[in-house]
Amino acid sequence: MDKVNNNCCCGENAKPCCTDPNSGCCCVSETNNCCKSDKKECCTGTGEGCKCTGCKCCEPAKSGCCCGDKAKACCTDPNSGCCCSSKTNKCCDSTNKTECKTCECCK
């Protein structure tokens, strides 16, 4: 049985994307695992066997891209064009790692 990534936890330390209805992920209260929202049985059923496999939310965060506990989902989404600066915890442009001035995520 695959080990569930603890970063997918939907408890106190849940990633913002786990609770964002637009992210394609949701939380299973019974098991506190993040799962794809198209698997409704994961969200409303027993949660048994629910594993987070295709959900981007549950992939490990790239180092240097973390914006703290309350990071916006787009800051950790590799497809958003944004990333986070670990030094200042500000959202920044992923192409040049400078502080984000034009990224929609940071508005």
Swiss-Prot record:
InterPro entries: Metalthion_7. It holds the Pfam family Metallothio_Cad. Residues 1-2 form a propeptide. It comes from the Eukaryota. Keywords: Cadmium, Metal-binding, Metal-thiolate cluster. Induction: By cadmium. One of its GO terms (molecular function) is cadmium ion binding. Belongs to the metallothionein superfamily. Type 7 family. The metallothioneins are involved in the cellular sequestration of toxic metal ions. Binds 12 cadmium ions per molecule. This is Metallothionein-1. It comes from Tetrahymena pyriformis.
